[in-house]
Amino acid sequence: MNKSKIQKFAVDGHKLLYKQIAQRAYQYGIEEENVGKADATEVRGRILSPLEKSQRAALIAEINANGYQQTIERVTYIWFNRIVALRFMEVNNYLPSHIRVFSDASGAFKPEILNDVLHLEMEGLDKAQIAEYIENNNTEELYRYLLLTQCAELKAALPDIFVFGARDRDYTELLFPNNSLS
């Protein structure tokens, strides 16, 4: 096995993920030089949902306590570990649903979870939310929702990797990168 290729992949993947997470923080009005007000109800012209407001406030509190770079780096490591664990579980058929999150059975990046969404049984899955995403043809948000729900379901089995705080306080969920289907 060529370990240098794996190391390069991990380093490059980490750098890309860090940039994507920092971009996501930026979308919520959080920058290294200015984290903004924790009680904001609107950011960059977009009104925040109650869940987003709570998660954003928790993120700002974490940044104020530990610094911007350290917080973004921590979230990057958390998501990197979650993605690697999900992929490992997917390839080895360890996921409780036995439905792949990142690929299809042939290994192509065509998430089975999107194809089997109407038959999916997962703890915490909101069928009405799924129907709304499908109705609005919002595949990216549907995929994001399914991936986050899969992570939340796995926290009982693997709390060290998939630990989420109270759902409204877990800012790592807020920072999961956009365009995860790209």
Region roles according to the model:
Residues 1-182:
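Charged, often flexible domain-edge or linker segments that flank or initiate folded functional domains
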